[in-house]
């Protein structure tokens, strides 16, 4: 018997030597923004679930494992999801077996109580090592997790962009976002003691190829993190909506990001031997229409879609006056509806000035109850609010261009926070919040992403410092109307007074 046991131990030892490296497959998504539902053209969580489940079956046969991660911004983008506080998104990720997600800045679009509800629904870790409570100090959610796979372990540290402090500050409350790199350096020794492989699940943004936003806050990007920090094996990133078709390697760190809107899913295959990555490969897989949708995920998310669609008919406010969005009117003069839209843009972002193009306003709202569907008819393009940092001189350039626009053009400018007189194709007597404009002062100006990119001839705005909030203009108007409750009267206020009409 003893001889038999000795032979058995010897065989096990020999097999372990020649067993080869362990196989770990990592699937990752980011910036899905409410796109839980696919279309006939592809995309959606149900198709992603099919690929993940297939890999689980295949890898299990060889004794490997699958890790599924999301790099943040589950929230905000599709009305049917937004109406339901992204509950269908988080439930779908739960049933898809998501192991963890990092917090994205759009997880703070709504009151903190909503995020807490989403956490309860999700039943998977929300990672954010640098999202801390200012009063008690320390992270609000889990800073990291350790996944033990028997022969090896993986540590996952979550980080959220410091940009959140200027992008979505309203609902941070007594919490804040602290320096991502400093936080990572604090947790790395702890995680390295417990794990063989270290992954940073980050919502920081990748800007190694340029396009780094110019903001009034210091922030870290994933490429900078890879360059500056040692001891990290992989950074799975989000926030910049970058499609890295194959991961890039920076300072021996694998950096991956999979685009946005659930159009793709990233896959990284690792082979791990003796606690080290000995080989890897990575790709981004487009979720094309030929990938079948997982029937369970599709079934229950379709039911939520119906609920969300019905929610579009829910009343968000009441107006006792006709809100004028007639094409001929908003392309020639300010109206009560254009003023309402611009006021809502300031209310949502805290900007000093709002700029809105008349061509973006596509319908009126009759007196009576206002539904979200009504609002989407007024603002149907899905444009997002874009905040720029403009000097007084920059604003004068905008106004002087607007002063040359003849009636009937979509570039007709509507404003909030600002008044001016237009005469002879020039803007004069310009005041911002009642005070004369200071040409050297920098102002916070909100417009939509179309105008910010130079649309409708506002080319002087293209390339100016600023950032996309990813707040849909329709959502901003909906929330502002809900805030007002009942619109008793919303008259035109002659914000841009045309002393001579440009025809």
Swiss-Prot record:
Recall the GO molecular function terms of this protein's record. 5'-nucleotidase activity; UDP-sugar diphosphatase activity
Temperature effects on activity: Optimum temperature is 80 degrees Celsius.
What this protein catalyses is: (2R)-2-O-[alpha-D-mannopyranosyl-(1->2)-alpha-D-glucopyranosyl]-3-phospho-glycerate + H2O = (2R)-2-O-[alpha-D-mannopyranosyl-(1->2)-alpha-D-glucopyranosyl]-glycerate + phosphate
Q: Which residues cross the membrane?
A: none
Q: Does the keyword Signal apply?
A: yes
**One Gene Ontology term, aspect cellular component:** outer membrane-bounded periplasmic space
What name does the UniProt record give this protein?
Mannosylglucosyl-3-phosphoglycerate phosphatase
Its ancestry begins with: Bacteria, Thermotogati, Thermotogota, Thermotogae, Petrotogales
**What is the gene called?**
mggB
